[in-house]
């Protein structure tokens, strides 16, 4: 799988976990282990992907990190989503923002910040509303400037 496809699966897992706190991360990840991202299973409506061990480790790291640092990530989102409360942000955008901010904050050695932002914007275009792209890009660009200013 490409890194973009892995990011997309990561987003889908986080989005699913937003609504299903009753299932474990491991069970959620297991649902994604066997199929192809271009096809969907009508019954479960989940993309089916073939994940390598490296892909699973990457996804597990991001998902665990987002869950463990959710309060901190939400604080960052609240700071840079001017005029928006977390409750008003659609769940697609919120999941994308949490995922990307985690990657920017904790994994910038592995992924350049601009790449993280671009990938997040592409995912928001695909799964969000027509305004998602601009909203996600605005929040992440503001956070990017703050990170660059701190260095």
Task: Tell where the protein language model's regions lie, with residue ranges.
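N-terminal interaction/assembly modules
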Residues: 1-133, 137-151
């Amino acid at each position: 799988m490409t890194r973009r496809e892995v990011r997309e699966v990561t987003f889908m897992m986080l989005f699913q976990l937003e609504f299903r706190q009753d299932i474990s991360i491991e069970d959620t990840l297991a649902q994604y282990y066997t199929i192809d991202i271009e096809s969907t299973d009508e019954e479960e409506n989940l993309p089916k992907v073939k994940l390598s061990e490296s892909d699973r480790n990457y996804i597990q790291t991001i998902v665990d990190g987002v869950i463990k640092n959710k309060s901190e990530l939400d604080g960052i989102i609240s700071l840079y989503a001017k005029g928006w409360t977390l409750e008003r942000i659609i769940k697609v955008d919120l999941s994308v923002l949490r995922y990307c901010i985690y990657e920017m904050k904790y994994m910038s050695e592995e992924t350049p910040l601009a790449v993280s932002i671009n990938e997040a914007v592409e995912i928001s275009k695909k799964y969000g509303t027509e305004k998602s792209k601009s909203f996600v890009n605005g929040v992440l660009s503001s956070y990017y400037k703050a990170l660059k200013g701190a260095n």
